[in-house]
Amino acid sequence: MKSELRFQLTLSVVAVATSMLAGYAASETAPPSLASPDSFASIADTEARSAALFTELGKVLTHPRCTNCHPAGDRPRQGDASRLHQPPAVRGADGHGLPAMRCSICHTNANFEPGRMPGHPEWHLAPREMAWEGKTVAEICEQIRDPARNGGRKVEDLIRHIGEDTLVGWAWAPGGVRSPAPGTQKQAGALVDAWVKTGAACPAK
């Protein structure tokens, strides 16, 4: 009986160790890169070049690190598989959760690696009108340049928002076994800058 228990414990330890190693390997995997704005210089038509720049940026905007917090409903999603958040948190009136379950209860000022808990001082869901989950890159483009659906921003404001905002920047340093968004925040900001300067055109639907 003791030997059987010992065997079961050994199997459990091996399973946990294997899971941890797999998670570590996943966290060490380099994210896909982003093409630089210069890569699109050969596109002579300015509008077509602008649309191509946004299509490249779309690799970031449609990544789970972004769409999980820009959900179609009132519940955030989590993980690379975009599962519904557990425990079942909901948006609340201000995007920071319900009075009894504020986002900040679990999501503190920084990532908490022992618990694989993401964190940032302003952790919250994007407003409903900024939902991207399930949308095409073209649909997100039309939305993100519309002040009524982008938080009241001009397209020029998006350069700093995507390129410098620290909550947005969390997507490139998510911790745990979460895959980071493609490229770097600086590269994403450069794409937004080039997109705006070429007229902020959107890809064809």
Where are these regions (language model features)?
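The canonical Cys-X-X-Cys-His
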Residues: 65-73, 100-110
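C-type cytochrome heme-c attachment and multiheme electron-transfer modules
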Residues: 48, 55, 64, 117-205
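General "foldedness" signal
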Residues: 23, 71-74, 80-83, 117-120, ...
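Generic detector of leucine side chains in alpha-helical contexts
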Residues: 5-11, 21, 34, 53, ...
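Post-cleavage N-terminal segment of exported redox proteins
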Residues: 2-52, 64-68, 72-77, 193-205
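Gly/Gly-Pro-rich "capping" loops immediately C-terminal to redox-active cysteine motifs
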Residues: 78-104, 113-145
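Electrostatic cytochrome c docking/interface patches
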Residues: 39-60, 76, 80-96
